[in-house]
Amino acid sequence: MMMARKQDVRIPTYNISVVGLSGTEKEKGQCGIGKSCLCNRFVRPSADEFHLDHTSVLSTSDFGGRVVNNDHFLYWGEVSRSLEDCVECKMHIVEQTEFIDDQTFQPHRSTALQPYIKRAAATKLASAEKLMYFCTDQLGLEQDFEQKQMPDGKLLVDGFLLGIDVSRGMNRNFDDQLKFVSNLYNQLAKTKKPIVVVLTKCDEGVERYIRDAHTFALSKKNLQVVETSARSNVNVDLAFSTLVQLIDKSRGKTKIIPYFEALKQQSQQIATAKDKYEWLVSRIVKNHNENWPSVSRKMQASPEYQDYVYLEGTQKAKKLFLQHIHRLKHEHIERRRKLYLAALPLAFEALIPNLDEVDHLSCIKAKKLLETKPEFLKWFVVLEETPWDATSHIDNMENERIPFDLMDTVPAEQLYETHLEKLRNERKRAEMRRAFKENLETSPFITPGKPWEEARSFIMNEDFYQWLEESVYMDIYGKHQKQIIDRAKEEFQELLLEYSELFYELELDAKPSKEKMGVIQDVLGEEQRFKALQKLQAERDALILKHIHFVYHPTKETCPSCPACVDAKIEHLISSRFIRPSDRNQKNSLSDLNIDRINLVILGKDGLARELANEIRALCTNDDKYVIDGKMYELSLRPIEGNVRLPVNSFQTPTFQPHGCLCLYNSKESLSYVVESIEKSRESTLGRRDNHLVHLPLTLILVNKRGDTSGETLHSLIQQGQQIASKLQCVFLDPASAGIGYGRNINEKQISQVLKGLLDSKRNLNLVSSTASIKDLADVDLRIVMCLMCGDPFSADDVLSPVLQSQTCKSSHCGSSNSVLLELPIGLHKKRIELSVLSYHSSFSIRKSRLVHGYIVFYSAKRKASLAMLRAFLCEVQDIIPIQLVALTDGAIDVLDNDLSREQLTEGEEIAQEIDGRFTSIPCSQPQHKLELFHPFFKDVVEKKNIIEATHMYDNVAEACSTTEEVFNSPRAGSPLCNSNLQDSEEDVEPPSYHLFREDATLPSLSKDHSKFSMELEGNDGLSFIMSNFESKLNNKVPPPVKPKPPVHFDITKDLSYLDQGHREGQRKSMSSSPWMPQDGFDPSDYAEPMDAVVKPRNEEENIYSVPHDSTQGKIITIRNINKAQSNGSGNGSDSEMDTSSLERGRKVSAVSKPVLYRTRCTRLGRFASYRTSFSVGSDDELGPIRKKEEDQASQGYKGDNAVIPYETDEDPRRRNILRSLRRNTKKPKPKPRPSITKATWESNYFGVPLTTVVTPEKPIPIFIERCIEYIEATGLSTEGIYRVSGNKSEMESLQRQFDQDHNLDLAEKDFTVNTVAGAMKSFFSELPDPLVPYSMQIDLVEAHKINDREQKLHALKEVLKKFPKENHEVFKYVISHLNKVSHNNKVNLMTSENLSICFWPTLMRPDFSSMDALTATRSYQTIIELFIQQCPFFFYNRPISEPPGAAPGSPSAMAPTVPFLTSTPATSQPSPPQSPPPTPQSPMQPLLSSQLQAEHTL
């Protein structure tokens, strides 16, 4: 307590009196000098507590109140302040003034009657209970303010503040004021109290007044002056603290700050506080709808708010808040305005998009037009009050419609004008686009595939550039190119179909030979549709290869009209017509052909089958489902490793019918097991109804777990596997050929390819395997096939509706999805007819593999391809089968007006006349035709039924007698099928009362084939014996002697006399006049006694075959050959054959002659038949001089039309092909990839071995290659066509043999030709186990080649080149450098880098041609090799990139040199030297030649 009091005592207290001019208005003017404001600011400095108005005119009552208390001074209260030395002090402030009575306007009378000057100088003030003064409003309302009394009612004044007003006061003279102040000062000075002069209102001060005041102060001793402004709160505290310093001498002297410097500090403080307050407001207030009371309450506790209110007051704070609110509202309105203006163009586009409607309307008229639009209210809103920004619509955020009064603003009018301009520009751009497109369509220079860079100069002009960007024209050009390319492709595909006869005559397979492709070039080369794709050779190549694939492998999926293939349409029509209750029961039967299930046999001993089955199952889903091309298939595997004669190891069980078989081997013993098992399986089903195992698709796979692709044992296994695959006519896959791995490295892609092949086989079986045999004729009397062309301009419904709507139409009993049964009255009896409706491409495969009594062939009269396919089909149909041609037209008027329709109708009718067929035309526009239209044709079929069945029976007897028939039907008998297993639809060929064949017959083998095959197997006696025995059995499956029931003999000329009525009543002849020779030209020297059962000569007539005429009575009709023709040297020259021929020479010519094909009877069929004599059956792999010689010898003596098909008058074609293939296969097979050369008399230890065995680090180049290249560069660089012209095969073989014996062989001394040396060098690379460019690198090379930028492409290729194995890289560098040198002499040798790449890329790369992708990628391979040759210095010698010859930098030809497909001239032409022969035409299919073709040049 004592301490507190001591501390209180220590706080000094000062009583300060503020004096200055006072009095009436006469003395002081209209306002005072600011004493009250100065006191107010010092005592209560907060802006809200500061009052500017303090009146001195009071009423008597106010004067007498406790605040004034009848005194002429005011007590302002007590103030605590901390001075500069941090010492706190208290100050009591008193203001000496003079109050004026509001009645008399004279000073109020008070207790002290002295004048103001004396009263103001008083140092003792007393006024009992006098209250502290706040403001004028306090007077009379003292209770509403704080009531604080003057302490003790008295004060002793310690100092005076003498105020001088330096502003320009109203009605006041400053000099008079100064006189008053001077007198007052003199009076104050008498008190000896400190005095400080305070200049008030300096914010409005007059410079002269301030200067005079300072002059006055200077005239007085130690009189200090402080410049202040109470309103601006400048130096107010400084005035009082200065006086306190004078009062208390112990305190330091206060520094007096000039007014303007102090004002600057105060302004900075206020500005800082304002910025902080504005930041606070912007942070708190986000919505323009906020109000001040709520916001001020939120800010009450914020220092920023408190500081600003203290300095500037609440009103200014509120004013700033309102300004912020106004700004937020303005920003909000502007945002809404921008949104509305942004939506306005969209509204214009939606409501007035038509330029014609608004082109000449002003904005005002357009506004009226907008109101009439149906969707006006969707875009605009009409407000009751305007303008829109002054209404509550601005806060309606859900309504985004545009206020309609916005249209009256200038921005809206500008947007409307912009909209008009946009519409006008769009119209112009559309006109430019149309004009550009018309230019494209009419310009003769725009052809499919022409690059934009070449076309631009022909079609662009300045107007086009003015209105549209070039990218737009490029886009239009690209779309136009796509259209014309698609159209050109469609037209080219139609062209290929129009030449269907050519493709079927050439008998193309998966690897067509270059000679056959040359024929395609010759025939199609002049067609405009062929030339149209000149710049798209890769696409044209792909279309040709795709069409070849279709011809070779016709399915619904490969059909050019897919998915609108006729077969699919027919299946849908028939399935929708008939609901078969038996379908449910058929799901579990053996005849189920559901392609969603794959049954696969895996054959291999010693655990091979089981291991592969486990690997395949690992690739399946949990429920044994396998995904192929995105579709799920159920996969059922049956691994077999034991004796297949045992039921447990049988290929087929009551619940498992195989669709294919994978045969595995890894040794000679396991290969022998495969051969024995296949033989046993085929023998067990040979004479049975379900003999489809004979044609089960097989795939032979060499298992090599180590992944070793070298070594003599592996090569021997590969070679033997290829020989066995050739014998069995199955696919062979080995680890080096297609990336096949086994064990952990099984190739899922290859497994998928195998399964796809099985699916294709099943689909083909769906079309042809459901027919019954002759034995089933009790159920079906006739089998008719109706052929339709896919893609014809008529609906299959029009053709089938009369059939399906007939009441006699029933579902086929065999469950075929393409067949129906008809019961029609033909003659005196009703006949059951099985009508199969198929596409032409499906019908090709059944012409000789299925019993068909007649064909109804449809074609469109206005489509060339339709009639072309019909001609191709009829070429291979026997002339005893009746044909009904049906032409579909658009009506009689169309026929008269359309030359094509008229020509095709005429041609169809002429074909029918020449083949003695029937012809009719049906307008598609007329009501549907009736079945009665075909009644005459059905009568012809009935008349020829017996001879057709007898002929088919004989053909199948010959077929059953030789199980070595190729699993893939011969193209001559039908369309060739890739990996298909079309079964013979006939199940039994014998009468039901006995078996024609005996399964345990033992027949001798062919010794010559045996010996040859033994040599091939390299001394493997066990396998040699098995294969020789197997081969002999395959070739000698003739029926043993049988004892049939006594046949009922009859004279065929009597029973079949109707066949010889061609000269009566216009009946058509159905048999050719050429002699009928047995199709199986059996050689008694090759066969044992059972031969007599079939072809033993008879005394008067020879039984050719027997037909079950009436199965219920067991009668056998024996058809005899009354006039057997001479063999004309075409047989084997045996005595028995010559004797038989001698017996027949003098016999009378029979009216019955052997059936021939329609091609021999009709001049309009087989127009490309001449090409058949030029080529052998099969691909280039099967071509060779020995086979050619054999075919030439076999065809000698045949003249005329039959010369093109000698087998038809000699022997059964299937047996002949088998024997010929066996002889051919005794030669060296053509594996892929090709292993080393294996010849019967010479085994090389240099050629055909891995590259690493013939090079060393010291000599990285094989010495043979080095010798060859040195010889060629020394003598052959000027040789025309070097590397393109093949050398003599025997000389190349001799060269290799001699070098193999002596590595120091001197080529110059031996006098070998340059072409021989060049061919031997190419042969060296062809015979390498792996190509010089490794397969693993070829993929990277192709990816690098796809880069468009030329320089980047070359650098990418160079990086791939660095990854080559060292040996391969060195040899490749050596060879490419040599070829580069050869190309530099192209003016002489005519071998440019392009020509050299065409010759060398198959040798160096040897790609796999088993897929369409590989075939179509050949252009990339050739171009890659060409780039290596061209840029040899860059790739191998770090030289800069050079420009290719004949191409400007950056030109398309420089970027990607092209190789023409089916063109006779290279893409890059080189000038020929004067008087030199023209360049040798490049082989059209050279880009498609595989490594085997290269080997063929060397053998």
Curated annotation (Swiss-Prot):
Record key words, sorted: Cell membrane, Cell projection, Cytoplasm, Cytoskeleton, DNA-binding, GTP-binding, GTPase activation, Lipid-binding, Membrane, Nucleotide-binding, Nucleus, Phosphoprotein, Repeat, Repressor, Transcription, Transcription regulation
Required for phospholipid binding and regulation of the substrate preference, as annotated region: 1213-1236
UniProt-listed Gene3D superfamilies: FF domain (1.10.10.440), P-loop containing nucleotide triphosphate hydrolases (3.40.50.300), Rho GTPase activation protein (1.10.555.10)
Record keyword Cell membrane present: yes
Main location: cytoplasm
All residue ranges annotated as the pG2 pseudoGTPase domain in the record: 783-947
Highest taxon listed in the record's lineage: Eukaryota
Expressing tissues: Expressed in the developing kidneys. Expressed in all regions of the mature nervous system (at protein level). Detected in neutrophils (at protein level).
GO function terms (MF aspect): DNA binding; GTP binding; GTPase activating protein binding; GTPase activator activity; GTPase activity; phospholipid binding; protein-containing complex binding
One GO cellular component, as annotated: plasma membrane
One GO term of the biological process aspect: positive regulation of neuron projection development
Subcellular location: Cytoplasm, Cytoskeleton, Cilium basal body; Cytoplasm; Nucleus; Cell membrane
Site entry: Arginine finger: 1284
CDD domains on file: pseudoGTPaseD_p190RhoGAP-A, RhoGAP_p190
Phenotype of null mutants: Deficiency leads to perinatal lethality and defective neural development. One third of the fetuses show exencephaly and spina bifida as well as defective kidney development.
Pro residues compositional bias, start-end: 1471-1484
SUPFAM superfamilies for the chain: FF domain (SSF81698), GTPase activation domain, GAP (SSF48350), P-loop containing nucleoside triphosphate hydrolases (SSF52540)
Domain Rho-GAP, chain residue ranges per copy: 1249-1436
PTM note: Phosphorylation of Tyr-1105 by PTK6 promotes the association with RASA1, inactivating RHOA while activating RAS. Phosphorylation at Tyr-308 by PDGFRA inhibits binding to GTF2I. Phosphorylated by PRKCA at Ser-1221 and Thr-1226, induces relocalization from the cytoplasm to regions of plasma membrane ruffling and prevents the binding and substrate specificity regulation by phospholipids. In brain, phosphorylated by FYN and SRC. During focal adhesion formation, phosphorylated by MAPK1 and MAPK3 at the C-terminal region, probably at Ser-1451, Ser-1476, Thr-1480 and Ser-1483.
Domain FF: 270-327, 368-422, 429-483, 485-550
InterPro entries tied to this protein: FF_domain, FF_domain_sf, P-loop_NTPase, pG1, Rho-GAP_domain, Rho_GTPase_activation_prot, RhoGAP-FF1, RhoGAP_dom
Modification sites for Phosphothreonine: 1226, 1480
Quaternary state and interactors: Interacts with the general transcription factor GTF2I, the interaction sequesters GTF2I in the cytoplasm. Interacts with RASA1.
Free-text note on domains in this protein's UniProt record: N-terminal part (1-266) has GTPase activity. Required for proper cellular localization. Mutation of this region is a severely defective loss of function. Mutants have defective morphogenesis of neural retinal tissue, agenesis of the corpus callosum due to defectuous midline fusion of the cerebral hemispheres. Mutants show defects in axon guidance and fasciculation. The pG1 pseudoGTPase domain does not bind GTP.
Full protein name: Rho GTPase-activating protein 35
Organism the protein comes from: Mus musculus (Mouse)
